[in-house]
């Protein structure tokens, strides 16, 4: 295999496409469906909450361990949003 057919470890670290990022200065930007904070109704942009780092998950290996239950601080009468309730 010639040297031009593969990248060395140091080339891979400096590559702007490492870990699927477009550039290395990605901080807490929107990751859409790739974000661990993504929800199609509540957070379609995949933005991280204040104080948390946005990390993309590997869609082929990531598995939720349990169903996510929203915390409503004891309020039982708050209806969950649905796509039918969205305003045009």
Curated annotation (Swiss-Prot):
Where in the cell does this protein reside? Cytoplasm
Keyword annotations of the record: Cytoplasm
What's in the GO CC field? cytoplasm
- The main location is cytoplasm
Q: Which domain of life is it from?
A: Eukaryota
| Region named Disordered | 1-23
Task: State the family named in the UniProt similarity comment for this chain.
Answer: Belongs to the AIM4 family.
**Name this protein carries in UniProt:** Altered inheritance of mitochondria protein 4
Organism source for this protein? Answer: Lachancea thermotolerans (strain ATCC 56472 / CBS 6340 / NRRL Y-8284) (Yeast)
Taxonomic lineage per UniProt?
Answer: Eukaryota, Fungi, Dikarya, Ascomycota, Saccharomycotina
Q: Which gene encodes it?
A: AIM4
């Amino acid at each position: 295999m010639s040297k031009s057919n593969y990248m060395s470890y140091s080339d891979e670290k400096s590559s702007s496409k490492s870990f699927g990022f477009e550039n290395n200065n990605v901080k807490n930007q929107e990751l859409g469906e790739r974000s661990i904070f993504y929800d199609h109704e509540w957070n379609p942009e995949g933005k991280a909450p204040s104080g948390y780092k946005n990390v993309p998950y590997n869609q082929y290996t990531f598995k939720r361990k349990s169903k996510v239950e929203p915390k409503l601080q004891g309020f039982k009468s708050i209806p969950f949003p649905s796509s039918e309730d969205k305003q045009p």
